[in-house]
Amino acid sequence: AAGVCNIETGVPATPDTLFQIGSITKLYTAALAMQLVETGKLDLDAPVRDTLPGFAVADAAVSRRLTLRHLLNHTSGIDGDFFKDAGRGEDRVEKYVRLLKDVHQVHPLGHMFSYCNAGFVVAGRMIEVADGTTWDRAIRKRLAKPLGTPAFSTLPEQAMRYQMAIGHVGQPGALSVTPIAYLAQSNAPAGSMPMACARDIITFARMMMSGGVAPNGTRVLPAGSVHAMHQRNVTCPARMNIDAAGLGTFLWDWDGDGRYEVFGHDGSTIGQASWLRYHPQSETAMALLTNGGNGKGLADDLIREVFTGAAGITPVEPPQPVAGLAVDRARVLGRYGKASGTIDVIEKQGMLVAVHKPAADFAVLQASHAIALQPAGDGLFVGTMPGFTRPVTYHFLEANGAGRARYLHTGVRAYRRMA
């Protein structure tokens, strides 16, 4: 452990400090769902409405046909960055799911991978109904307790019994404590609230690498469920952040043999970020929890060092610009959008530039910014965010009748063309 829990108090971080783990929570929600699939209380391929009869999104056909599998592998097409606060009562997840009735599709059901936070809250509600309890109680009873990780917390009043880290925002050298300590509790199954120490996350990874058996010898998941979570369901078009998705799990093929051998997830909340990678073949796992600064750069370096040294495999380098590559600018120019904001691809001083503008509800998470794009392949571009060195990929997909891209895929999300 290094650094401090809070720059205003100067309290040092320790191996026992709890950090917000963000979307690493999705691994836990998927594991809960798979436990209930194993007992027959949930079905991966049955309509969500079999469990939640009144479930609805804006698209009536999707409301009827959506399955748990679509939710866990991010192929629902639901515009998933929907962070409305449904309160703090024990019915908060249920209330949140009701709010989805007006949420539209980014793409048709099952059409492609596009990261969907809302889908995991729906899965959390299915867990509640199937298990007859709240998601918070289910995760403590079914995962935290058998794993032997009692400090794993899903509510602030649980976490305050331990040492906690607070998030920090701003640039390195000018960081300040985040004005918002937590995201909405109603989004907890997607990762808004849970807190854990790095050891807790590694314990979960060890369970997954051991076919569902925790380090303390307790069987947490059937081996078949772990295997299912590690199987490719869908590939990610912009292969930089991840290569493919399983059931709640991200997959990587670092050695290029066509098989996925590294698993895990990333997470972020306001001012905190987390990374988990594990390689069952070598029994190597790495967790990094941060509460400010350029955590992404540290994570990239640490992942490379740990897995090159301990597992003998090295992460694939991101795509690089290709000099002289012909670009069909008419294909990519235009506005792309989803609930979280818009990306305008414009021409400026002879260059293509992606101008990111967050929606009003997302301004606290990310400021407007522009990224110069350089061609790296057919429909593939790379650019570097301000303050970072590792490039981001922009993948322009499919074509409409005018030969213009229908979708822009970046940050593991699809944005549909708006203009």
What are these model-derived regions, one by one?
Residues 33, 204-208, 306:
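Hydrophobic "lid"/C-terminal helical patch
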